[in-house]
């Protein structure tokens, strides 16, 4: 059984998801696209207990929670508001901040909106997702200010985080991207990111920084470009430079800056939205499906940074 269809307009979204019961049915179909199977006995038929978000097996009576074991685990927020939050995150061009989400959903507390967005960001990375491939640009920069290739600058970051970008080359444009925070610009850090983000055998373009030299021994067709400076630096790796420019504009414009602790999860969102920029309504469906594949996130975990790829 394929995944359920997704709404193709705001009008359809409002018509489809006007009640918590409708949202629950869609969540069931998204979480079990091949049909429900009882975790205890394997039976494929169940009663819906909509008021408690449960499915009760018709054979053994086991009650399976639709939201247990997902990012929606033990939520007290109505499913309709979760669906609206996922819709706004996936389809709103500039994204949405916690302050904006609080206003849009008429939430009493800012913290509720913040937690919802953080949980959705953690659901944006598919477990065991594919690595990008083909011809790829790779570059690194300090978030908050591109150092334009100054080697001295690469060693000094202050409060800035070092982010590495890998961008597929598609004609004159960009394909998929991957972003990650690294501790430093050593070969171990940079090559480690590439190995997690780019498939071996790919053609990898970088600047002339020595940290990228080991890529060739790792099975990549590494083609370093002559290091530039000043106004010529963006021309070396234009797609990666454009990705960094868009990332920093988004972080400052929508979120007014992001601290290092939570930056990896904002990178998750940027990558998710960028890679689905041509199909935003389908991205909503994808996000709901991914939300059902992730383990619960505790409030304490929301304050712990985790690596992205």
Language-model region placement:
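Residue-level recognition of single "structural anchor" positions
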Residues: 1-309
């Amino acid at each position: 059984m394929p995944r359920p269809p997704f709404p193709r307009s705001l009008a359809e979204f409002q018509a489809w998801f006007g009640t918590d019961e409708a949202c629950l049915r869609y969540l069931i179909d998204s979480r079990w696209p091949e049909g429900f199977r009882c975790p205890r006995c394997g039976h494929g038929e169940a009663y819906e207990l909509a008021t408690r978000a449960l499915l009760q097996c018709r054979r053994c009576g086991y009650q399976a929670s639709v939201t247990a074991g997902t990012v929606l685990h033990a939520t007290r927020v109505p499913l309709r508001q979760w669906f609206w939050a996922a819709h706004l995150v996936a389809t709103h061009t500039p994204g949405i901040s916690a302050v904006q989400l609080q206003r849009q959903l008429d939430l009493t507390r800012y913290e509720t909106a913040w937690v919802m967005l953080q949980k959705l960001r953690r659901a944006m990375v598919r477990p065991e997702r594919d690595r990008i491939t083909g011809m790829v640009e790779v570059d690194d920069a300090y978030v908050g200010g591109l150092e334009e290739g100054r080697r001295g600058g690469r060693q000094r970051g202050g409060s800035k985080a070092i982010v590495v970008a890998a961008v597929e080359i598609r004609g004159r444009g960009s394909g998929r991207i991957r972003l990650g925070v690294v501790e430093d610009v050593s070969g171990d850090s940079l090559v480690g990111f590439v190995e997690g983000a780019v498939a071996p055998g790919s053609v990898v373009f970088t600047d002339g920084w020595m940290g990228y030299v080991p890529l060739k021994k790792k099975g990549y067709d590494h083609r370093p470009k002559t290091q530039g400076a000043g106004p010529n630096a963006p021309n070396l790796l234009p797609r990666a430079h454009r990705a960094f420019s868009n990332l920093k504009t988004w972080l400052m414009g929508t979120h007014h800056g992001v601290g290092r602790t939570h930056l990896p999860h904002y990178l998750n969102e940027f990558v998710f939205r960028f890679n689905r920029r041509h199909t935003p309504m389908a991205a909503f469906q994808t996000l709901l499906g991914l939300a059902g594949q992730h383990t619960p996130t505790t409030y304490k975990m929301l304050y712990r940074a985790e690596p992205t790829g």
